[in-house]
């Protein structure tokens, strides 16, 4: 399974005395052991609006409905209007490439996607915390160096969230597939070459290869690498950061906890302590590519898009009658919906109904991106609409994309204070609405300032957080989780 780099922190649910409130269980991402909850509060991380499912549906009925649905939409997306798809100049070459991809083994397996959906269902019920992150857009030529840095950043964020927030963390990376991005302009100029502005590396292939002096055969060797086991990590980068002392304090507390576990016979050599789980995700944009990697699962008979464990539909492609929504309703992967201040509450309810007609927990994650001011005004209406429809979703805040501005040099940047303001607004709104939230971020390992942006701006789309900012955000969220936990425990009988 692939790796993520920084944080997409989801949210958690306030305790409720309603009869449908589930019994709480700890689920560790890398083990099946269970612990008795410390109190009546849910532990962590995805905001689940506290309403029961609209219509209780048995597993057999849900499977039958899903099979019927899949058989009807496997090819039907081609008859719908598809925005943001490039105009391929040579359909013959395109067909040849798609047939080659169809013959490839899957990048992920259906069972893995099902496992992620189960974990996201725990997040939707308030029993886990979603940590999602990665570059806005990937490049074929630097995957391996980036993955190493992302893994270090994610490990430090996860450590702070798990130990500081006392909750299991689900780690999902925006990687091993986030090569294509929708753009406002169909073409853009780069070093004298006019490239497709819509879809990046997979579309402007020959021009990019010419520009970067990188042969397609070499680039293909770098497309994806999946890891299922963690390795020792070098976290020296925190020693000289503003958060270094806080992180070292946390490390000492973790060491004390490990000492206690060792005394109880659970050492760091135990398989539970030596492995971890990472999941991949990307935007479902290039539909011919996505269909070429879609496979029927022999176990369930369902279709899974095996290009990633989780897919999402973007702000520019989420039309109810569009090709992207039509395709996504036909695959059984966990799905995300990107939502801005433009989203109408009723439209969101209808979109969730289309993508998750059986109201299955873990199927839908709503990723909100609209800036701090819009968050306080628009988000309450979205939460109330979804809650009123009785829909089970995981709410996530993406504070990056709503805070992109242009620096004087013309390059894009994001003010960290604006990012923090949106995160705080997201938490405040959910607290106001009776739920408690989290965040998604795109992060990296380089500090980018106005002064050195021209020489250190290596991202292929929008700017990243650096490692220090990513860690700082994790500290802020974990400390808020701990504070809220203390308040809830103080009021527990």
UniProtKB/Swiss-Prot annotation:
SUPFAM superfamilies assigned to the protein according to its UniProt record, in alphabetical order: Aldolase (SSF51569)
Pathway per the UniProt entry: Metabolic intermediate biosynthesis; chorismate biosynthesis; chorismate from D-erythrose 4-phosphate and phosphoenolpyruvate: step 1/7
Enzyme class: transferase
Compartment list: Plastid, Chloroplast
Annotated EC: 2.5.1.54
The organism's place on the tree of life at top rank: Eukaryota
The reaction(s) this protein catalyses: D-erythrose 4-phosphate + phosphoenolpyruvate + H2O = 7-phospho-2-dehydro-3-deoxy-D-arabino-heptonate + phosphate
UniProt keywords, alphabetically: Amino-acid biosynthesis, Aromatic amino acid biosynthesis, Chloroplast, Plastid, Transferase, Transit peptide
Pfam families cross-referenced by the UniProt entry: DAHP_synth_2
Any single GO CC term annotated in Swiss-Prot or TrEMBL for this entry: chloroplast
Gene3D superfamilies on file: Aldolase class I
Location of the transit peptide in the chain: 1-58
Gene Ontology biological process terms from the UniProt entry: amino acid biosynthetic process; aromatic amino acid family biosynthetic process; chorismate biosynthetic process
GO molecular function, one term: 3-deoxy-7-phosphoheptulonate synthase activity
Family, as annotated: Belongs to the class-II DAHP synthase family.
PANTHER family: PHOSPHO-2-DEHYDRO-3-DEOXYHEPTONATE ALDOLASE 1, 2, PHOSPHO-2-DEHYDRO-3-DEOXYHEPTONATE ALDOLASE 1, CHLOROPLASTIC
Designated name of the protein: Probable phospho-2-dehydro-3-deoxyheptonate aldolase, chloroplastic
Source organism of this protein record: Catharanthus roseus (Madagascar periwinkle)
Gene expressing this chain: DHS1
């Amino acid at each position: 399974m692939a790796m993520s780099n920084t944080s997409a922190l989801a949210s958690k649910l306030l305790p409720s005395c309603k009869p449908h409130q589930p019994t709480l269980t700890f689920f560790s991402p890398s083990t099946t052991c269970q612990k008795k909850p410390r109190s009546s509060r849910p532990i962590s991380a995805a905001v689940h609006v506290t309403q029961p499912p609209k219509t209780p549906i048995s597993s057999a009925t849900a499977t039958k409905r899903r099979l019927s649905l899949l058989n009807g939409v496997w090819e039907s997306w081609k008859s719908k209007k598809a925005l943001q798809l490039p105009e391929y100049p040579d359909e013959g070459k395109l067909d040849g490439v798609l047939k080659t991809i169809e013959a490839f083994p899957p990048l992920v397996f259906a069972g893995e996607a099902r496992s992620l959906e189960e974990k996201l269902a725990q997040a939707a019920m308030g029993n886990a915390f979603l940590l999602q992150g990665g570059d806005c857009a990937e490049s074929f030529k630097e995957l391996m160096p980036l993955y190493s840095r992302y893994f270090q950043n994610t490990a430090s964020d996860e450590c702070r969230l798990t130990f500081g927030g006392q909750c299991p963390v689900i780690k999902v990376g925006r990687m091993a597939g986030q090569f294509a991005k929708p753009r406002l302009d169909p073409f853009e100029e780069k070093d004298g070459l006019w490239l497709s502005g819509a879809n990046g590396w997979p579309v402007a292939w020959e021009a990019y290869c010419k520009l970067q002096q990188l042969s397609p055969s070499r680039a293909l060797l770098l497309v994806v690498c999946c890891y299922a086991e963690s390795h020792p990590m070098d976290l020296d980068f925190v020693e000289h950061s503003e958060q270094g002392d806080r992180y070292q304090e946390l490390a000492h507390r973790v060491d004390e906890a490990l000492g206690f576990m060792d005394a109880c016979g659970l050492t760091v050599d135990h398989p539970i302590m030596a492995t971890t789980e990472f999941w991949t995700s990307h935007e479902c944009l290039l539909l011919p590519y996505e269909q070429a990697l879609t496979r029927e699962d022999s176990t369930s008979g369902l279709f899974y898009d095996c290009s990633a464990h989780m897919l999402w539909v973007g702000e520019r492609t989420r039309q109810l009658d569009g090709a992207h929504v039509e395709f996504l309703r036909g695959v059984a992967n966990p799905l995300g919906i990107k939502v801005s201040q433009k989203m109408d509450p009723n439209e969101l309810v209808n979109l969730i109904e289309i993508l998750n007609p059986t109201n299955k927990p873990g199927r839908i994650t709503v990723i909100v991106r609209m800036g701090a001011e819009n968050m306080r005004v628009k988000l309450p209406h979205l939460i109330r609409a979804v809650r009123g429809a009785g829909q089970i979703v995981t709410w996530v805040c993406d504070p990056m994309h709503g805070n992109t501005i242009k620096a004087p040099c013309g390059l894009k940047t994001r003010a960290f204070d604006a990012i923090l303001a949106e995160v705080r607004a997201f938490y405040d709104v959910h607290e106001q609405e009776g739920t408690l939230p989290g965040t998604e971020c795109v992060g990296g390992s380089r500090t980018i300032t106005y002064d050195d942006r021209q020489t250190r701006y290596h991202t292929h789309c929008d700017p990243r957080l650096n490692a220090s900012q990513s860690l700082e955000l994790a500290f802020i969220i974990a400390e808020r989780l701990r504070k809220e936990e203390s308040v809830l425990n103080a009021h527990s009988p």
